[in-house]
Amino acid sequence: MLPADKTMNNDMLYHTHTLTNGIRLLYVPVESPVVYCGFVVNAGTRDELADEHGMAHFVEHMLFKGTERRKSWQVISRLESVGGQIDAFTTKEETYVYTTIPAQHLERAMELLADIVFHSTFPEHELEHERGVVLEEIQSYNDSPAELIYDEFDNLLFGDTALGHKILGTEKTLQNTTSMRMRQFVQRCYTTDNIVFYLLGNVRGDKLVRLAERYFGVPPTKRTFRRVPPETYRPTTQRSNKDTYQTHCMIGNRAYHQLHDDRFALLLLNNILGGPNMSSRLNMSVRERHGWAYTVESTLTLYVDTGVWSVYVGCDNSHERDCLRLIHRELCDLASHCVSPRALAKAKCQLEGQMLIADENRENMILTMAKAYLQTGHCLSNDEVHEALQAVTADKLRQVAADIFDKRQLSTLIFN
């Protein structure tokens, strides 16, 4: 067995091991007939060069289109033939390739995952076909202003930098992508010291290590490419005519990075303001009291060296000013006044409960753990999260709100 590193969610243990080539293993043993496993690669949109917009996402698509020993249909059918599933997605900082598989077919899954991550060939004829698929994916986003506004707001916050670029890229950059450029991107970013393989399931740790050594034994490689830190932020207001039935508004600011001392205070603050609960301040004010919007929410994304906090609302054109006024009023109130002790205790209890419920989705839980281990080398336990949240004071919440919700630092994007 691998040595236990830490008590994790729901009192489970997680274990880690590093292969001789630098690939890290994260293992959570649970009683289940199903195994969740996959690779998370520390390579995403922000690792693209100036002429590679959309490359990380396009590579993710092409991983399923053929390897040195498999055609695309063989990749797809290898796990589906035994009832398994394989999928992938790309973020600004990571690429995930993952499977859900009956436990008895774990070796089949690990061999296939290794084949597509380490031995994909990116055939030209498949590239031309998949280019059309990704272009249609871009068009589907363009037809959804409630999704598109998040991408364009990132561009407002980070400008013409990798963090400001759309994950899907653009039609122009996709047309310029070649198989050779894809292989160069993978060679630069998919290095063994840049990869975590994770597994949650009823598998012995020594078996996992043995299979990993058998199938992941590629030569060691090291990442030499360094991410460019975000440029100086300048708040901006922008209005764009999208010919929509509704007005779509987004207000926000750059936020803290994922290891910032005040990240738990901001997480709690965001949940109070516009988290996924009907009792959030924004939902009660904008939707329940006035009926001016169907969707009003705030979101928080933490990156390795920065973050994004934002509020989104979709409303009738006639209610745009009213909604923005109510949002700013809530922001000002949180930045100017301390929440009551009772409200603070309720907010902490609510957030911890939401986290516990979210952990019942085992796939989401292990994906979250894998990202944390990849980026920080550590997975927080429930006890650590509880202690961090309990340490947040009402005055700390107000200080963080005054910092992040500072009206002089807010950017605004409006589609109408």
Regions inferred by a protein language model and the residue ranges of each:
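Flexible, small-/acidic-enriched active-site or ligand-binding loops
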Residues: 236
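Short strand-connecting beta-turns/loops that link adjacent beta-strands
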Residues: 30-33, 91, 244-245, 406
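Charge-rich, well-structured scaffold segments of protease-associated domains
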Residues: 2, 18, 74-223, 229, ...
